[in-house]
A protein has these predicted regions:
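Acidic, proline/glycine-rich short linear motifs
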Residues: 40-69, 149-150
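General small-molecule cofactor/ligand-binding pocket signal
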Residues: 36-38, 86-90, 141
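Glycine-rich, Arg-bearing micro-motifs that act as flexible, cationic patches
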Residues: 109-131, 149-150
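Short, flexible loop segments at boundaries between secondary-structure elements
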Residues: 140-146
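Small/aliphatic-rich secondary-structure junction motif
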Residues: 2-53
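Structural beta-alpha unit
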Residues: 1-2, 76-110, 147-150
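Short, conserved catalytic or interaction motifs in soluble domains
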Residues: 13, 122, 145
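Short, hinge-like loop/turn segments at secondary-structure boundaries
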Residues: 52-56, 104-106, 128-129
Length: 150
């Protein structure tokens, strides 16, 4: 098995991201790697451009607080498994934030789900995963969540 020092896990709080986090925790335990958990968000420009709406700072603050709390919950899962880690919260397009964070922190591996909370369906991969694979400075391991029992 490869020896990893730093593993980046982009999290959007979907079931696919949860599955990726579980796998990343196992890989980190086996290799002694540190986890970097990243959540990136942005307001779609179509909302502000089409309606000329300025989003109140209190709304942005609420988004940041909720995301920070969810990131800390994810980090607590890693720490409970004996894995060290840190969190990153960025306001940027997700794939760009993933690639930039991976480069800045000299990440050895990105582990991410193939679909998130975008609501868009792509034939094989979600758009963020697909773009990340193309621009990432390191290997990207993608996985899909287990199908839900019917």
């Amino acid at each position: 098995m490869a020896h990893f020092h730093r593993i980046l896990v982009p999290v959007d709080f979907s079931k696919h991201a949860d599955a990726a986090l579980d796998l990343a925790i196992e890989l980190a335990k086996e290799s002694g790697a540190e986890l970097h958990l990243l959540h990136a968000y942005e307001l779609p420009s179509s909302v502000t451009m089409a309606y000329g709406v300025a989003i109140p700072q209190s709304v942005w603050d609420g988004v940041q607080e909720a995301a920070t709390a969810k990131l800390e919950e994810a980090l607590a899962r890693a720490k409970a498994a004996g894995v060290a880690g840190t969190t990153h919260l960025l306001t940027a397009p997700a794939a760009d934030a993933i690639a930039e964070t991976a480069a800045a922190h000299k990440v050895d591996l990105i582990v991410m789900g193939t679909r998130g909370l975008t609501g868009l369906r792509h034939v094989l991969l979600g758009s963020v995963a697909e773009r990340t694979i193309r621009i990432a400075p390191c290997p990207v391991l993608t996985l899909k969540a287990k199908p839900e029992a019917s």
